[in-house]
């Protein structure tokens, strides 16, 4: 179902209007409380700047960390307000609380084009309970609603879902619109062949995604720690590699399902082993049927990289979610880096490359290739749920186009 977006609202619609914008500002901080990666703040700028240009009064709502419904001084949005002020080139006023007299006074004092950042909504337990009274208090600050927090769209919270019952219009921001366009588009109407690369350490966290992707894709490539559950299910010995014993039957079923559907399901043919889980462990590369006892697999090997590159060469759409190995250790990052480089090359040849959230985004950024990809998703859980074909409450609640 297509959703109405901010693009459909003109300056005449928005001038002097108070617009509540849900953003995803859940950024990492270092021990000194400084922001170490402002990607999520920058991702919201197109929506914020568009609203400023159209003369709206911009009221930003965000969560930060998990304060569990209580005020936590270390989880205030003060560093975010400071960084956003720098990026916008204008002062962003932060409130003491997201609802109540201070928020009301600061919103009432706004002029057209001003930006106010409401304090962490999760300081109130009512936020995650999607409490209607709390949602109404948030909504009372504004005349219209924009949801640009794709990363929180899979949660039915007061600021992502509840407020839409009290604000009209309720529309998708530019980032949300782009996320839906790419991720939904890749699933519903992709240019084919469509391939998915799924990595990460556990099959259990990707079951729904793997099942959905086997239904929709022409090729599914699997890497990361989860491959050892598949190998063990095939009867291979995996040394002391990570295995989910309770998922062996599922691994067999997934392979059988792919075969029955004529989907190419590719697993690595060789792996890079370590004698210990550490950056300077001893390592060796072996075929998957020759893993010795006492060793664990921490990356895919060079033959597997070639196999995966060949499989991807003719693809028109590629979705990547999850690293191929323990890329945080340089010695075991070759597989992940090779996939990042391959996708960057494919993008240059007109392939639509989508990096679906989480660790793969970090890997692509670490390799300096983020700009080369068609789309980098800002959602972790939200991306996975959308790829699984689930309805995201924060999206469903918006006005239909």
From Swiss-Prot:
* Claim: ATP-binding is one of the keywords in the record: yes
Signal peptide coordinates? none
Tell me its EC number(s), please: 2.7.2.3
Q: Where in the cell is it found?
A: Cytoplasm
Which residues are involved in binding substrate?
24-26, 40, 63-66, 122, 155
Q: GO CC annotations?
A: cytosol
CDD domains the UniProt entry points to: Phosphoglycerate_kinase
- Where along this sequence does the record place binding of ATP? 206, 297, 328, 357-360
Q: List the keywords (alphabetical).
A: ATP-binding, Cytoplasm, Glycolysis, Kinase, Nucleotide-binding, Transferase
Domain of life, per UniProt, equals Bacteria
The GO annotation for biological process reads:
gluconeogenesis; glycolytic process
Catalysed reaction, written as an equation: (2R)-3-phosphoglycerate + ATP = (2R)-3-phospho-glyceroyl phosphate + ADP
Which HAMAP family is this protein grouped with?
Phosphoglyc_kinase
Name of this protein: Phosphoglycerate kinase
Tell me the name of the encoding gene: pgk
């Amino acid at each position: 179902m297509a959703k109405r977006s901010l693009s459909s609202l003109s300056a005449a619609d928005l001038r002097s209007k108070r617009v509540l914008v849900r953003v995803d500002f859940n950024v990492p901080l270092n021990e000194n409380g400084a922001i170490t990666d402002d990607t999520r703040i920058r991702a919201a700028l197109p929506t914020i700047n568009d609203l400023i240009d159209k003369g709206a009064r911009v009221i930003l709502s965000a969560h930060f960390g998990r304060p569990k419904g209580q005020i936590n001084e270390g989880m205030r949005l003060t560093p975010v307000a400071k960084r956003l002020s720098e990026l916008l080139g204008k002062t962003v006023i932060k409130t003491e609380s997201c609802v109540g007299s201070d928020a009301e006074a600061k919103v009432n004092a706004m002029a057209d084009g001003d930006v106010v950042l409401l304090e962490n909504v999760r300081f109130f337990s009512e936020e995650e309970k999607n409490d209607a009274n709390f949602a109404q208090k948030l909504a009372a600050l504004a005349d219209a609603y924009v949801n640009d927090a794709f990363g929180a769209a899979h949660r039915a919270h007061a600021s992502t879902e509840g407020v839409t019952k009290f604000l009209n219009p309720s529309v998708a921001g530019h980032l949300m619109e782009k996320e839906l366009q790419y991720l939904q588009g890749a699933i519903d109407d992709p240019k084919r062949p469509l391939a998915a690369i799924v990595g990460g350490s556990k099959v259990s966290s990707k079951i729904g995604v793997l099942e959905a992707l086997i239904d929709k894709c022409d090729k599914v490539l699997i890497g990361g720690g989860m491959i050892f559950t598949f190998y063990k299910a095939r009867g291979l010995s995996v040394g002391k590699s990570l295995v989910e014993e309770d998922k062996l039957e599922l691994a067999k079923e997934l392979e059988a399902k792919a075969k029955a559907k004529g989907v190419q399901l590719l697993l690595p043919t060789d792996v890079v082993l370590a004698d210990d889980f550490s950056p300077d462990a001893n390592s060796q590369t072996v075929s998957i049927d020759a893993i010795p006892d006492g060793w664990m697999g921490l990356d895919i090997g060079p033959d597997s990289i070639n196999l995966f590159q060949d499989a991807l060469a003719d693809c028109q759409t590629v979705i990547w979610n999850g690293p191929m190995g323990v890329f945080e250790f340089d010695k075991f990052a070759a597989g992940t880096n090779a996939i990042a480089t391959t996708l960057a090359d494919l993008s240059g040849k007109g392939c639509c490359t989508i990096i679906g959230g989480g660790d793969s985004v970090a890997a692509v950024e670490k390799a300096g290739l983020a700009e080369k990809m068609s789309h980098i998703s800002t959602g972790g859980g939200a991306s996975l749920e959308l790829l699984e074909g689930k309805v995201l409450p924060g999206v469903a609640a918006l006005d239909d186009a």
